[in-house]
A protein has these predicted regions:
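Well-ordered mid-protein domain cores that form the structural environment of catalytic cofactors
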Residues: 117-121, 145-147
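Sequence-specific dsDNA recognition surfaces
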Residues: 5-24, 36-67
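A generic structural signal for short beta-strands and their flanking turns/coil linkers
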Residues: 29, 47, 93-95
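A short beta-sheet element
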Residues: 34-35, 53-116
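A short glycine-rich beta-alpha junction/loop motif
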Residues: 74, 89-97, 109, 129-158
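Non-catalytic DNA-recognition/assembly elements of restriction-modification systems
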Residues: 1-18, 143-182
Length: 182
C-alpha cells in the first residue's frame, strides 16, 4: 500500500502546548512537568515542582494531559518525547508540545515512533527558532508532515517496535536498581 503524508494536526485530534505561566512553587499539591522532567520512557516527578490545586485546574482547563497523549520538549532541550500510557494523569505541563489523540492508542503509538524517525527529527531541526534558547514554534509542530501507511502496515510496524521499547525500559529499570544497590 502507498503511504500518504498529512499534517500532524490532521493526524492527531489536536496539537497544543502546556502553560507558559510560571505558577508559584508549593510544598504540596500537583506536579508541574517541564521539558527537563521528560526522560524518554518515564517522567522524573521527583525533581518537579508542586503547584497549587487552583493553578493546576487553570492549566488543565487549557491543556490537560490525557492517556495516549504525547509530550514533546520544544524549548531548550528539543525533541524529547514521552507517551502517557496511564489512564490517570495528575500533573500539568509547562512549555512543551502536547500531541492529543482522544484515546486513540493506535495513532498515538504511530506518532510516538514517527517522532523518533530521521524524517521527523530533520523537520524539527529545520524549524528551530531562537538565538539565546532554541525552540520549535507550536505552529511548526501542527504543520509537521507525518508519513502514514495503511492501518495494517502501521500496526505491524508498531507491533515490532513496542516490545523493543518495553525491553529497553526493563533494562533501564534493572540498571537503575543496580546503581541504587552499589
Amino acid at each position: 500500500m502507498a503511504w500518504k503524508t498529512v499534517r500532524a494536526d490532521e493526524f492527531c485530534s489536536f496539537v497544543t502546548d502546556g502553560t507558559h505561566d510560571s505558577p508559584k512553587p508549593q510544598s504540596q499539591g500537583r506536579k508541574l512537568i517541564t521539558s527537563k522532567h521528560l526522560k524518554g520512557d518515564y517522567i522524573d516527578f521527583d525533581s518537579a515542582n508542586w503547584i497549587s490545586e487552583g493553578d493546576y485546574q487553570k492549566i488543565i482547563a487549557r491543556s490537560a494531559v490525557e492517556q495516549w497523549d504525547i509530550l514533546f520538549s520544544m524549548i531548550g532541550t528539543i525533541g524529547t518525547i514521552y507517551l502517557e500510557k496511564s489512564p490517570i494523569v495528575e500533573y500539568a505541563c509547562k512549555n512543551m508540545g502536547v500531541f492529543k489523540f482522544a484515546g486513540n492508542a493506535e495513532n498515538a503509538f504511530w506518532m510516538y515512533y514517527y517522532l523518533k524517525s530521521p524524517q521527523a527529527k530533520e523537520y524539527i531541526q529545520s524549524h528551530l527558532r531562537g538565538s539565546t534558547q532554541a525552540y520549535v514554534p507550536l505552529g511548526s509542530l501542527r504543520e509537521m508532515p507525518v508519513s502514514i501507511p495503511d492501518r495494517e502496515t502501521r500496526n505491524r510496524i508498531v507491533s515490532l517496535l513496542k516490545p523493543l521499547d518495553e525491553k529497553i525500559a526493563t533494562n533501564r529499570a534493572i540498571n537503575d536498581n543496580l546503581m541504587q544497590q552499589a
